C-alpha cells in the first residue's frame, strides 16, 4: 500500500467514526431526513452513552423534559452504555428521572458502571433491564483534590457525604439493607446481568424483545 493510499484510507476511517446514520421518513408532505438519534427520540428512546459529564447530562435532561411535554403518560426508554463519570452531572439526570411524570424504563447495553449503574437502577420499578452480556459495576465515589490541608479536609468530608447519600439511594432502589450496600461498594464490584437482577439493581434480563401481539 502506498503512503498516499494509506493516508486516504485513514481519513476515510476517521470520517466514518464520526458518521451519524440518516433515515428517510415518507409522508403525504414528502420526504424528511432525520439523524438516527432524532428519529428514535420520536419513539421516546434516549441514549446515555459514554462518560457522564455536564454537557451530556444537559442533553439527556432536555430530552426527558421534551418527551414529558409531548406526552406525560407514556414511558421514556433510556438506553445506558456508560463507564460512569461526574456525580453532580449524574445526579441532575437522576433527579429529573424522579421529577418527571412519565416512567423512565432503563436498559443496559454493554456496560453500566459507577454513575451509569446508579442511573440504571434509578429507573421505574419493574422497568429496569439488562441485555444478557451487559456488565454492571458499583463502587464508592472517587475524588482527588490538592491544596491547603483545611481545603483537603473540606473536600474529603464532601466526598464522604456524597458516598453516604449514594448508598442510601442504592439501598432504596435495590431493596438491599444499607450495611450490605456499604460493604459491597467499598471496592469495584462487577456483576453479570443475572447477578445484577438477583441483587436488585435491575428487574429482568432481556434475551429477546417482547413484541405486542
UniProtKB/Swiss-Prot annotation:
One of its GO terms (biological process) is protein quality control for misfolded or incompletely synthesized proteins. Its main location: cytoplasm. Keywords: Cytoplasm, Hydrolase, Protease, Serine protease. The active site is at 114 (nucleophile), 139. One of its GO terms (molecular function) is ATP-dependent peptidase activity. Pfam families: CLP_protease. InterPro entries: ClpP (IPR001907), ClpP/crotonase-like_dom_sf (IPR029045), ClpP/TepA (IPR023562), ClpP_His_AS (IPR033135), ClpP_Ser_AS (IPR018215). PROSITE patterns: CLP_PROTEASE_HIS, CLP_PROTEASE_SER. Its EC number is 3.4.21.92. It catalyses: Hydrolysis of proteins to small peptides in the presence of ATP and magnesium. alpha-casein is the usual test substrate. In the absence of ATP, only oligopeptides shorter than five residues are hydrolyzed (such as succinyl-Leu-Tyr-|-NHMec, and Leu-Tyr-Leu-|-Tyr-Trp, in which cleavage of the -Tyr-|-Leu- and -Tyr-|-Trp bonds also occurs). It comes from the Bacteria. GO terms for cellular component: cytoplasm; endopeptidase Clp complex. It is an enzyme of class 3 (hydrolase). The keyword Hydrolase applies. It is found in: Cytoplasm. Cleaves peptides in various proteins in a process that requires ATP hydrolysis. Has a chymotrypsin-like activity. Plays a major role in the degradation of misfolded proteins. Belongs to the peptidase S14 family. Fourteen ClpP subunits assemble into 2 heptameric rings which stack back to back to give a disk-like structure with a central cavity, resembling the structure of eukaryotic proteasomes. This is ATP-dependent Clp protease proteolytic subunit. It comes from Pseudomonas putida (strain GB-1). The lineage of its organism: Bacteria, Pseudomonadati, Pseudomonadota, Gammaproteobacteria, Pseudomonadales.
